[in-house]
Amino acid sequence: MAIKRRKVSVIGAGFTGATTALMVAQKELGDVVLVDIPQMEGPTKGKALDMLESTPVQGVDVNITGTSSYEYTKDSDVVVITAGIARKPGMSRDDLVSTNAGIMKAVTKEVVKHSPNAYIIVLTNPADAMTYTVYKESGFPKNRVIGQSGVLDTARFRTFVAQELNLSVEDITGFVLGGHGDDMVPLIRYSYAGGIPLEKLLPQERIDAIVERTRKGGGEIVGLLGNGSAYYAPAASLAEMVEAILKDKKRVLPTIAYLEGEYGYEDIYVGVPTILGGDGIEKVIELDLTDEEKATFAKSIESVRNVMSALPKE
């Protein structure tokens, strides 16, 4: 029997989606399909063609297709969802949640129809609630629906620590629990530089400053750009997750996972350390938390549930 080429479909051809498609192609993880709405089919095809024409120079052998038709996504191994709208001035949180939940449902129906065995990674904000929506709509098992936030937050944290210590980012490890921004729970006790606990290398006030900058990381970039938000680091984070699944790497990564009793919580998607491999989220890693970490995580859970309360009722 012929060996099937791997396929990764990216839904949403904006800055993050297009950059994700390019990074997946550069890693030669499989053929790439970039999908957007019919009104954006021209630009989507143009971006995909531009990427495809770069492959001979980069020495990667993949097909890259731009389309508005989900037919091209048939039998995808992994589907990455970046589609959705950003919050606009005057838009309420409930409006944002409701609108993006509607988009998630429409996209998920197409994914289930054309790729019933796919693993789905969700980036669309608010990511915890949107991942939950995709999980419920798809009917897929929890290990095959995964959200992205912690990989990005951890990458930012590692970057800032490496800059502070003037060390290679490769030697910096760290973890965060919970959601993005102020809801992030930094696990400094599990953060190291070359195997040395961070607390042995930096004074507490510098660690606190790095944590705060990490929490505000997305906002810092928004402020500098003036229009738009981060997309290189989010795309790199998504590509890392796709690679972990397709290569069955058994990576220990913080992802948005469905909890069924872990950490004492039920029926919620939230950021926790996981083992990510060929069967998606293969395990949620439960860490012993201090009372302070438990309290901060509980606050993060409360915030996620608050956002989920704005999801349209069935």
UniProtKB/Swiss-Prot annotation:
Keywords: NAD, Oxidoreductase, Phosphoprotein, Tricarboxylic acid cycle. It holds the Pfam family Ldh_1_N. SUPFAM superfamilies: LDH C-terminal domain-like, NAD(P)-binding Rossmann-fold domains. Coiled coil: none annotated. Substrate binds at R87, R93, N125, R156. CDD domains: LDH-like_MDH. Disulfide bonds: none annotated. NAD(+) binds at G12, A13, G14, F15, T16, G17, D36, N100, L123, T124, N125. The active site is at H180. Its EC number is 1.1.1.37. One of its GO terms (biological process) is tricarboxylic acid cycle. One of its GO terms (molecular function) is L-lactate dehydrogenase activity. The keyword NAD applies. Transmembrane segments: none annotated. Gene3D superfamilies: Lactate dehydrogenase/glycoside hydrolase, family 4, C-terminal, NAD(P)-binding Rossmann-like Domain. The modification Phosphoserine is found at S149. It is an enzyme of class 1 (oxidoreductase). It catalyses: (S)-malate + NAD(+) = oxaloacetate + NADH + H(+). Belongs to the LDH/MDH superfamily. MDH type 3 family. Catalyzes the reversible oxidation of malate to oxaloacetate. This is Malate dehydrogenase. It comes from Halalkalibacterium halodurans (strain ATCC BAA-125 / DSM 18197 / FERM 7344 / JCM 9153 / C-125) (Bacillus halodurans).
